[in-house]
Amino acid sequence: MGIITNIAVQTKNPERFNVSIQKENGETLVFSVDQDVLLQFRLKKGMKIDEHSFQQIVYADEVKKTYHQALYFLSYRMRSEQEVVDYLKKKGASESIIDDVLHKLRENKYVDDREFAFAYVRTQKQTTAKGPYVIRKELEKLGVAEEWIEQSLAIYSFDEQVETAKSLYEKAKKQRAKQSLRQWKYQIGQLLYRKGFPQEVIDRVLLSERDEKEEQEWEALEYQGRKAHRRYEKYNSPMYEQKMKQALYRKGFPLEMIEQFLDKLKEGDKR
């Protein structure tokens, strides 16, 4: 291959060195290496370098550069191993380089999927309104092993899930339209399901709120009932009652309450 004729520190980056090699055919080859690679291979002026050694040096320097890229990526927040792998692939790193970099990152505790999973769950339950199923899906997408997902989700207790689900319920309640209780329960149940809460949490929230809904249920029935009344008042009495009951029942109101409403209309001579 040749002999090292000069080693000089780079002006703009004092942690990298330019190495000049006088090749056997008289040509000069100049390449750069990290200071750690320089020390690792004990490079010095006058040293003979063969092709195999040169390739080892180039590979080691590529590992070092990729390692620095990974550290930069990790400087913003904790990452899963899969996130690091995906990032380095986008940067053009080979599989073997990435494997060596990951090994070094693990050794230095810069990546740890178990710690990442626990930190992720803590952050999500404290700063978002996500249920455990959504968090699980996100961790799976980030490449975290099932073992760490199971362990980390265990810190999201049932009571904490209920409290988070209740806060979502309270926000949604402010925007509730004139709906039957059955429709409302279905709607809020779907909302909590999409947010990733298990059925037992949803049931607990809906059960704890049912007592305060009777008055709202009647208000919703009156609202929908008067709309239906205006639509069907042209019909004779038997047909009118049939259409009213069908319309309000489809809206989710119980038959007993519908009949009470119709009696109230009759008593008030609304027809």
Curated annotation (Swiss-Prot):
Keyword Cytoplasm: yes
Pfam families documented for this protein: RecX_HTH1, RecX_HTH2, RecX_HTH3
GO cellular component: cytoplasm
UniProt-listed HAMAP family: RecX (MF_01114)
PANTHER family for the chain: REGULATORY PROTEIN RECX FAMILY PROTEIN
Keyword match Transmembrane helix: no
UniProt family annotation: Belongs to the RecX family.
Compartment(s) of residence: Cytoplasm
Stated name of the protein: Regulatory protein RecX
GO term, biological process aspect, one: regulation of DNA repair
Top-level division of the source organism's lineage: Bacteria
Reported function: Modulates RecA activity.
Keyword vocabulary terms for this entry: Cytoplasm
